[in-house]
Amino acid sequence: MELNHEYGIMNTTPNIHAMIVAAGRGSRFGASIPKQYTLLQGQTLLQHSVARLAESAYIYQCLLVVAADDSTAQTLSFALPIYYAVGGAERWQSVQAGVEAMINAGADEADLVVIHDAARPAVPTHDIDAVIQAAMLEPYGAILATPVADTLKQSYIAANILSMPVHEAVLPHQHTQPELTINESDRDALHAYAQKTIDRSHMWQAQTPQVFRLGPLQQVLNYVAEHNLAITDEASAFEHLELPIRLVMGSRQNIKLTYPDDSILLTAILMAQFSSIVEIL
């Protein structure tokens, strides 16, 4: 797939558009409501995330991509003027719907779109500005990311070795995985085992915001749809086509609320950030 480069790196003063994807259900979080409406310090995650974007001098309004049956977003007050689009079943489909809405509203293909997760309310303002400034100098875009600090293990799933007959047990030196027929009643007996350690020297953890040229983003998402690709973020779509996306060093404060115990850490981070602002004032 070839993309038109005429609106690429030469346009270093593009218009900036912002989008927050808030159409997901957050099944891993385990709450009865979508996690973007979880309250932290008296506001929803979504309100916090919009407020962070509002602190950037580059952003003056925000598109919220919500589920078709969402009845909450429009009852909330936000720090930016808001307009809406209806998302899809997958994250990339929600982003695609947002891109189409922006283009239909008159956005140019050379413009930049800042895509942020509703569940990342603690992103520092200077990181938002840094990734936007980096994307201005790139033909396709840039994303926030942090180098992986922990040791990474690749795993395999097997029955507990101690509970298996000796001739069925899979030991580390065998480098194979047992053929298991998994019944619902057997799931509690399955465990993850370390298979190998992954070299982390070139590994980064992707964050948001992710910032892309609008035209190329539309094209790569169309490619994803046509080829039924499985992607976990928008940068993945560019990677499939071997198109360069710049990595911009982010902050480890910019965590995503994914599991219930993440809320404890996020609350502490938000309180510390607020205290720092008060001290400056």
From Swiss-Prot:
It catalyses: 2-C-methyl-D-erythritol 4-phosphate + CTP + H(+) = 4-CDP-2-C-methyl-D-erythritol + diphosphate. It is an enzyme of class 2 (transferase). The record marks 28, 35 as: Transition state stabilizer. One of its GO terms (biological process) is isopentenyl diphosphate biosynthetic process, methylerythritol 4-phosphate pathway. Keywords: Isoprene biosynthesis, Nucleotidyltransferase, Transferase. GO terms for molecular function: 2-C-methyl-D-erythritol 4-phosphate cytidylyltransferase activity. Its EC number is 2.7.7.60. Pfam families: IspD. Pathway: Isoprenoid biosynthesis; isopentenyl diphosphate biosynthesis via DXP pathway; isopentenyl diphosphate from 1-deoxy-D-xylulose 5-phosphate: step 2/6. This is 2-C-methyl-D-erythritol 4-phosphate cytidylyltransferase. The gene is ispD.
